[in-house]
Structure formats: structure tokens, C-alpha cells
């Protein structure tokens, strides 16, 4: 019996290796090594042995591609390395602008690069699919996740195993302890067309496009359905431990994106071989124009190209923003356009009083979605279109996301059609509108305009500011319409009896909302500042202001006495400076500041957000990881504290981690930190260090 088991053990290893190699040759190299009959015979033998000895079934067995029992749902998993998006360019001029910016940045940081021509670029097709992160441990696929928000995605490992072009085991001797692969899952055009024919024949709604179809397939709870739809995958990047070196002489550690693609192909992945390397922007432009014509002949959907700095050392020099790497940009192809009939124009009033015309038209399909409205932006844009009621208009989706009216077909215009004009009075409060001389924006300047107030309140309770989840748009509208709230400060004067008079409020929900509103007074200074809704001041700008000015009083004084100090802040300019000065000049805003301070807002830097301004770089060069639930800080707040003191917060533990900040219900990171000898501290110890 033992002898028989040992024979089966050795044979099953041999079968797995033969079948995995055959899959790689067939699906990735498109060069079958064995005929189908031999493959079927080997596969049948594998299944027979696994049925006899279930303990010999491994994650990298070809039998596991078919998937198991249907899942009950998808759990969220944290990306060890953030899965960032790319910044977009919508024409070659914007590509040139990006190229110029990074060239200057690189030249200033690296004196060995003296001119633009020294930059090596790589151009790749932008596959119109779904970004996927794959994690391999000791060479075996252990997890696959969707992009999600870039930090956290959904675990779809079972479904990803069904994709034949994704290896279950890397073709690499002595692989590193972990490898992360990034790539694009997609549905080939012929599979998409076949699927829609089947759905039409069975009276099911059709999928709008291959991307949506792929996304829906990956979220199927039954992996057998996923397997039947024959998704495909292109790998485009990989990450591994810095100290790892290949032991196989046939492999060289990649030092560029182009070498990385070759490496990926050699370890078992399918890569898109249409990429090209170049040293000139002109050649990148030619690549873009070539595939703009040829893309419709491809077997898969592509919506543009991606241009990257090829060398990893230059990529590292450029780094990334919170959302995207600086060393890459996606250049989108022109959007799809369609004609439709204009039905009406509505005029929306924002929190700053800006009146925005919005076109409503007969519904059309653009880039796979139904569209029936689009913003016309401002008076200048409206005038340039020469838009008349019931015009036939051309609508496109910019970047396949935002619909826009690009022109009018005047030949179809009725003789008696009326010109669309901005109203002279606010559509909400009937106050006189003004067109500010330095802007193309028509505004309502009535501080008491309810539409402005509702917009400001929505901004104040948003995630980037007070983050009051219980105050949605419908509740805000009720509070304003009933006269309970006439300013931000009035939110903090609400009583339970007033809330109970509103729709869908019981005593418990009313109490919970009042508690949440009251707790928001403790938010950090930069969140309070952002919530005030100063025009042109976004969340990142508010944070920069809070880093330079410790209180609303200091910022107020600077705005009046030395406004140039504002425009001198990195990333600021005269427009932002003027907006801040104008905001503080408004007596209504001065009244709001007094009201907020009277009800308990500090409107200044607190000890929790700046323990010692003289030690702002106390964590310089130190690496932190957060785990569990902290006592008084959210993870984002703890991260802000650490980064403001010069530290770096990572999502995964390694030997290079200096501190693990641990809270309640700490997970596996705590165990790993103990194994690696990483110093473990709690929230109070973090505050003491600060």
C-alpha cells in the first residue's frame, strides 16, 4: 500500500509538470507540444490518481482550474502593494505635456540625464478589461484580487484559477518567497459575441461590452460559469523581494519594464507582444496612431495606449502620487460619438453659487452605457455651442466616462427654435445672477440661497471632511426645506424632536445621528478647513494650508496682511490665493467661523495631529505598519500623523519594518512582526514617540 502510494506520489508530480507545461505551450506560446488525445489521456490519469488519493491534490494541479463549489460571496483583501490607477491623457498634446513635466523632473533629480532624448520609453496597448493582482508564494498561486479602491479588493482566487493563461505554478526554479503579478483579465471579442448570442436566444439581457462582461463573470459565485466563459489574461508587471536573485542561469533579474515583460513570459505568463521601446516622443506618437487604426482588427478590446518610463531606477526616481505613478500615463483614443435630440436644459446651483447648465436629451448608448444628460459647464461653453431648444446634438463620452455635448447639427434645426440662454435670476432663490469678470461662471451671490446651502452641507458631511454617514442628501434636503438648518453651525444645534418629525426617523436613528454629528467636532484641522468649502481648495490643498498655518486665525490674518505667503506654497497660485482672500473678506464667512468656534470647533492644529512641531521629522526614514483597531484614531488619521512626522506607512510587514502599531483584533501581521523581531507599539506609545 505504502509502495503504491509512493509510486502515485511520484507519478502525480510528473503528470502535473507535463500538463502545466502543455497548458503553457498551448495557451501562452500558442505552440502545442502534444496532441489533444495525449493531453486527454494524461489528464484522465491525473484525475484517477487524485480520486484514489485526495490528499495528493494540490493548488497547482490542472484539475483545480475547473473550480469547486459555488462561493457564498467574496471577502475583501488588502493589497500588499497598492494597485494604483494611471493618469489619463486624451490626446497627443496632453502626452507631450506629461513628457515635458517628467523630463524636467528627472533632469533636476538626475544630473546624468541632460536632455529629453536620453529617456527610454516603452509603449503598450491599454487593454480594456479588469485589473487583477496575483500573489504567488514559493511559486504557487495563493491569492487573486480585484483592484477595488487600490488598497483593498475582492478575493476572486477560485474564479481566477479557471483562466488557462494564468499559471497555477511559476515556471521558475527556486522562486522567491512571494511574487505579486499585475495584469488585465479580459473577455476576447469572439467569446463576447458568442455569449451575447446565447443570452439573446435565452431572453437574457445582453452585456454592454467585453469589459462589463468580464467584470460580471469574475464576480460569478459559481466558478464553473467562469470557466465556461473562457476569459483571458495579459500580465504587465511584477514585484518581488528586493534581495531576491534568480538561481537559474536562464533568468536575469529585470531592471526595466521591457525586461520585466520578457521575464513574465518566461515564467509562464501571457504578455501582450505588441509593445515597443523608444527614445523619442515622436515614435510614441507613431505607435499611438498606428494602433488607433489597427485596434479594430485585434481579438480583444483596447481603449488606448500606455506610455511608461522603461528603466526601473528612473521610475523609482519619479515615484507616485496617492493615486497614480508619475512615470506612466494612459493615452485614450477618441471617444465614441452619437447624435440625439435635445429635450430640455436644467440649471443647477452648486455650493459656491455657480449655475451650471445641464442638457437632457433622448437616451443613447455610448461606450456600453445608456446616457441621457450631460453638463454644459458654463456660460462661455453654452454660448460657443449656439444651442437651441430641440436641436440635434452630437454627444460623446470623454475618456468613456463623462458624457459631453461637442457640437450641434444646425442643418436639422427648426426655423422657430429658441436660443438656450442662462437665466438672469437664480432658478432656486430668484436672486440676481452675476457673471464674475475673471471667470466664465455665472453665480448666485445670495448667501441664503437654499440650493447653495444644501451643496455646502453635502460637502461638509462628506468623507474628506466631517464624514457624517448618517447625513445623506435626502435628510439634508428635508432639514433645509423644513427650516431646521440655515447654516453649517445649525447642524450642531439640532434636537431630537426636530429629527423625529422627518421621514424615516425613529428615536434610535435620531440619537445615533446626533451622536455622529457631535463627534465630528473632533476632526483634524485640515478636515475642518476643507469642509468650509472655500472655492478652488481641494482636500490636498486644505492639508497643505493646515501644514503651513496652525489655525483659522493665522490663515485669516495672512489672507488680509500677507496673501503672497499663500501663493508661495508649493502647488498654489494666484487663483487659489485670491479665492482664499475673497472667502475671508465675506462677512458671512466670518460669522460662520465665530459660530463654529462657539459650538466647540477648534479650527486649529490640535495635539492629536501635531504633538511636537519642533520634531516634525522625528520618524524620518522609519517604516510603519498598522494592524487592528486603534483606541481613538482611525487608520487614516494614524497614517497622517506618521507621515507628517517623516515616516512611511506600508501595508505589509518585512524585515525592513521599524514599528508595527497594533490595536485590538490585530491580525496575522502581529504574528509576523513577532517572528521577524519588529518592534510592536500601541497607540499611546505612538503618541509618546511623537
Swiss-Prot record:
The active site is at 126 (n6-amp-lysine intermediate). One of its GO terms (cellular component) is cytosol. The keyword Coiled coil does not apply. Zn(2+) binds at residues 426, 429, 444, 449. It holds the Pfam family DNA_ligase_OB. Its cofactor is Mg(2+); Mn(2+). It catalyses: NAD(+) + (deoxyribonucleotide)n-3'-hydroxyl + 5'-phospho-(deoxyribonucleotide)m = (deoxyribonucleotide)n+m + AMP + beta-nicotinamide D-nucleotide. It is an enzyme of class 6 (ligase). Residues 614-690 form the BRCT domain. SMART domains: BRCT (SM00292), LIGANc (SM00532). GO terms for biological process: DNA repair; DNA replication. Keywords: DNA damage, DNA repair, DNA replication, Ligase, Magnesium, Manganese, Metal-binding, NAD, Zinc. GO terms for molecular function: DNA ligase (NAD+) activity; metal ion binding. Its EC number is 6.5.1.2. NAD(+) binds at residues 36-40, 85-86, 124, 147, 184, 308, 332. Belongs to the NAD-dependent DNA ligase family. LigA subfamily. DNA ligase that catalyzes the formation of phosphodiester linkages between 5'-phosphoryl and 3'-hydroxyl groups in double-stranded DNA using NAD as a coenzyme and as the energy source for the reaction. It is essential for DNA replication and repair of damaged DNA. This is DNA ligase. It comes from Prochlorococcus marinus (strain NATL1A). The lineage of its organism: Bacteria, Bacillati, Cyanobacteriota, Cyanophyceae, Synechococcales.
